[in-house]
Every structure is written in structure tokens, then in C-alpha cells.
């Protein structure tokens, strides 16, 4: 088996599973992109095997500490383990993330379940090569009627992979209506954002909605309206939602009608909306923006963006208002995000206390030693009157 030898002090020597290009001392056996390679230290000790791609900044991703090939039995076993974990954890098996990349030992593989449909992404060269085998294993293990390939994520560019959307097994289901936390959503597995719905925020909708009764709510970066819908159904006195994307605005309005709730929907840039002088006060403001950075090298700009966003939002918060805010970039550490939030609140001259932190649900598990698997950070803050 071809392979790589890593430099001293490489992260993989300390529990990480990735090998960056700068950490490779040398290669041997002429490894080919998409192949399984041996990963060794400078003393020729095997550290495990990983998938290889010289076109990616992450040249190797370890998926086993022992010698292991990628074959049908391997994929079936890993997917069975992923499904069993979620079932034992009490996850809702008809609406959840079935496979979450490195967190389930399948680097680059994402599989989301929407009733009878499974939506699959294979965002690494090796896994993309085996996508039909993976799809067959998913259908066999879950009993899904169809498996849809949604390989249109921008992360594929860094892997040198083409964009592709197709039905791998069964027939295209068309838009599906799903229910989550008492809220009905229309999901389009073939054309919706990402795989169709933000499954990682379903629990957060309920948490935030628990504070919405009797409050005027502003949901920023509303997307399909998850937070806005949950707050409206929970008894908010009014709900306003701001979203810039026309497709999302259309979906949001449709979901509001589907759930029989009144939401004031504004198609606008959130930063522009927040800085307008005629904005009213709100008792509950939700900030759930898309990732501000896809690269660690842009972290300073991202943190400035978070600081500015929270400074603007805090100025619209009522005396005893609540702010629920989220960051979905794994490049931004939790402490960095909290510091940016605190700086923004300071700019707005607002003192706030932390009510709770919100993390990823159990169907998006975090691997110790691999901080990149922990991307979702949430804070619920309450304004301190008289400060």
C-alpha cells in the first residue's frame, strides 16, 4: 500500500485525524488521489490508513488506525454503526442526520433522512468514487425508498470534484412535507438549500421558542423560517423575519401559510435592516447567519463581522430583551465567537447575562481530538436592566 510519512509535531501524532500538505515529510509508493494510503511516522510506525487527495489542503484523512480497504462490507458496517448510535441516543430516525462525515468514520460523507428519502453528499475524492456503494448500503440498512445525490456543495471545489445532483436509487420524490417540533416544513431534497433543511437547528427552534410567548420577535437570516415559525406558534405577540434570498423568502411565506401563523417577512440584507434609523425595539432577537468564513485565513474578517452584527442587533433589543445567537463555522472557536459577541455588546453599551449555551444535537456528534467536527455554537443572552 502506498502512503505518506508525516513530520514530527504533526497534528495526527496528537490525536487529530487529518494530515495537511505542510505536515508531509515524504510519500512512498506513488499514492493516487482517491486511494487509501498508509500513514506512518518518522520511525516507520503505522498511525493508520486514510483517504488521499493531493489536490486538497487536507492531503490525508484517517478513517482507521488499522489496515482497512474501502469495500461494500466496510461501508455497510460503518453505516450500521452510525444508525445504531443514533437509535440508541434516542434520535428521531425518520428526520435526522444519519451519517456525519469524520464523526462516523466516513470522511466527507453526509447522509440526511427525510422520511422515505435519504439525501447523500460525498465531499471527498475517495468517498465520491464509492458513492453508489454507499447509496446501496444506506437504502439496505434504512429501508429508504430513494437515495438522492446532492453533490453541489462548494466544498467540492477544494477537492477537485465536479458538481452533481442525481437520483441514485428509486424515483425522485418531489417536495416533501415534514413535521419537526410541531412545525410543518416543505422540503425539496433535489433543489432545497443544502440537503433540504437545517436538521442541526431543530432542537434550537424549540429552545428559543420557549422564551417567545408575549414577546415581539425578530428572526434574522431566517432562511425557511424555522425560528420564526416556532416563536409564532409558541405565542409571540408579533414575529418579523428578515431574509435576503428570494427562494428562501418564498419558502418562508409558504411555511407560514402551511402552519397558519402570521409572520411579517422582509426580503432585505440583515446588516442594512439593523442599521436603519426607524427600526422598532424587539423583546427577542435571533441571529442565525450563514458561515462568515470558509477558511481559517479569513478569521479576522469573520470576527469583525460578528462584532458588528451584535452591536447593531443589541441596539434594537428591549430593556429586558433576549438575544439568541449562533455561529456555524468550525473555523471560529467557541471562545473566539463569545469574545466577538461581547465586544459587539460593548460597542452597543449593553450588558447581558448568559442564560445558556447551545451546541450540536446528538445526530451531529463531536469527535474528541477533531475540533472541526464541532461547528455549531449558540448563546442565549438576557439584557441586564439598569446597566
Residue ranges of predicted features:
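S-adenosyl-L-methionine
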Residues: 245-286
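Conserved class I S-adenosyl-L-methionine
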Residues: 214-223
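Non-catalytic accessory regions of SAM-dependent methyltransferases
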Residues: 1-115
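Mobile active-site "lid"/loop adjacent to the S-adenosyl-L-methionine
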Residues: 248, 283-312
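C-terminal catalytic and target-recognition region of SAM-dependent MTase-like enzymes
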Residues: 281, 322-387
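Non-catalytic substrate-recognition/targeting regions of SAM-dependent transferases
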Residues: 99-112, 128-197, 206
